[in-house]
C-alpha cells in the first residue's frame, strides 16, 4: 500500500521560487535520462530542450488562460469575505470558494471589490454558486486579482499578469497556470518549427483543487477534484498521425498529461471529446497516450508528485528531487523544469511493466 509519507521530502524554503525569471527560457532544465541499468541527470537550460526532441515529435500544450479569480469584499452585515472563483458555469454564474467567519446564506448579496454585488445561490459542496449582475468574465477581468499560488508571498503585479500566463493562453477559465508551459516563448517555438517538431493544443481548466492537500495517509482513499477538459478533432488526428509516423507524444505539463490520459482508449488511441475528469494517477498506472513529460518541480505529498512518480518511477523521482535540491534548482510554479521519460514499472513497485522511452 502506498502512503502519503512515500511522497514527502524536505525542501529548503529558499528554493521556492517567488518570482518568474524575466526570460522564459532562462530557467533550468533537469533532463532525467534512463538507460537499462541506471538513471542519469543532465543539468541544462530550458532552451536546450531542443536537443532532446526529434523531427516528427508532437508537443501537446494546455491553452487554458488564467482568469483574475480572486476577490475581496464584504457581506451586507459588514463581515469580510474572500472569494476564489473555481469555474464559470454560464455567462452570469460561477462556482466559488468563499472564506468568511460564517458561511453566507443563499439569497443574500456580497459586495465584491467595492464595485458590484453578487447573489449567493445554492451550495455545491465545498463550493458556492454566485450570480453576477453582468457577464461574469467581464467583471472578473475588470475587478478581480490574479490568483497566485499560496506559497508565493507577494501580491500580484503587472509582471505576474504577464508571466503567470503562457504565451499561447487563449481559452479563459483556469485559476492556476499550466506552469510547464511558462518556459516557452515565441523564439523557442520558431526553433521547434524549424526542426520539424509539431505542436498541438488541448484545454483543461485548472481548478483550485490542484493546491488542495491530500489529507489521508492511504492515498487510495483520496478523492480527486474534477476539472473540465477538451480534446479537439485536430489534436486527436495529430496524435494519430504522430504515432503512425513513429514520432513521440510529449505532454507539456501535468494538466496536458491528465487530459490526454483521460481521453485515451485502452489501445492508446484518442478520440475528440470534452467533459469532466477526476483521473488520479499514482504508481501502478499504465500510461496510454504520453511518451515524455515536461513538468516543473512539485509540492511534497501532492497528487502531482504522485503523477510524475507514476510516470518516471518512484526511485527515479526521489533521486531527481534530491539532485535538484543539491543543485539549488528553483521549485514550484515559477521554478525550473524537468524532462521525464516514461519508465517501466520498477521492481517492488505496483503495476504492470510498460515499455520504456529514451531521450
From Swiss-Prot:
Monomer. Belongs to the QueA family. Its EC number is 2.4.99.17. GO terms for molecular function: S-adenosylmethionine:tRNA ribosyltransferase-isomerase activity. This is S-adenosylmethionine:tRNA ribosyltransferase-isomerase. Pathway: tRNA modification; tRNA-queuosine biosynthesis. HAMAP family: QueA (MF_00113). It is found in: Cytoplasm. The lineage of its organism: Bacteria, Pseudomonadati, Pseudomonadota, Betaproteobacteria, Burkholderiales. One of its GO terms (biological process) is queuosine biosynthetic process. Its main location: cytoplasm. NCBIfam families: PRK00147.1, queA. Transfers and isomerizes the ribose moiety from AdoMet to the 7-aminomethyl group of 7-deazaguanine (preQ1-tRNA) to give epoxyqueuosine (oQ-tRNA). Pfam families: Queuosine_synth. Keywords: Cytoplasm, Queuosine biosynthesis, S-adenosyl-L-methionine, Transferase. PANTHER family: S-ADENOSYLMETHIONINE:TRNA RIBOSYLTRANSFERASE-ISOMERASE (PTHR30307:SF0). The keyword S-adenosyl-L-methionine applies. It catalyses: 7-aminomethyl-7-carbaguanosine(34) in tRNA + S-adenosyl-L-methionine = epoxyqueuosine(34) in tRNA + adenine + L-methionine + 2 H(+). It comes from Ralstonia pickettii (strain 12J). GO terms for cellular component: cytoplasm.
